[in-house]
A protein has these predicted regions:
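Conserved, single-site charged/polar hotspot
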Residues: 1-145
Length: 145
């Protein structure tokens, strides 16, 4: 759900539209496989948290943003996945945030290894680094020896 901080700093049910102009977006918690489970938005009027993978996908995808995939598809009502990274876009020399760009990979549940993420990660990471990213605490051994 979406929750707003009230004047007593308590979280109450609310809507993203009440935060005003969004000044920052912070990933607070990630779940299994790296999907975002909790976001914090700070705005000119209020601060809110968005909880739950599907709520995050719906809120960010329904914001009027154009969602483009690597194949050029742009027909999504929600983000295809909560496996995302959010970066601010700055305008001008005074470093004012003009927008946020969302980078993502994969579709659906976010459990296991995302093929789209691995494709991009393989440009700069070894297979060992990629496996250890998706499967925490694993040890890679040669079992044939």
């Amino acid at each position: 759900g979406v929750y707003i901080y009230n004047e007593n700093k308590e979280l109450i049910p609310g809507s993203v539209s009440s935060v005003g102009n969004i000044q920052s977006i912070e990933v607070v918690k990630r779940g299994c496989g790296g999907v975002v489970k909790l976001l914090r938005l700070k705005g000119s009027e209020a601060e809110c948290v968005i909880s739950g993978e599907n709520t995050i996908r719906t809120v960010l995808g329904s914001s009027g943003a154009v969602i483009n995939t690597l194949t050029g598809d742009a027909h999504y009502d929600i983000l295809p996945s909560a496996f995302i990274v959010i970066k601010p876009v700055y305008a001008g020399d005074d470093n004012v945030i003009s927008a946020f760009k969302i980078y993502g990979g994969g579709f659906g549940h976010g459990i296991g290894m995302s093929q789209n993420a691995v494709r991009k990660m393989s440009e700069t990471m070894s297979y060992e680094e990629i496996l250890k990213f998706f499967y925490k605490g694993v040890e890679i051994k040669n079992v044939a020896a």
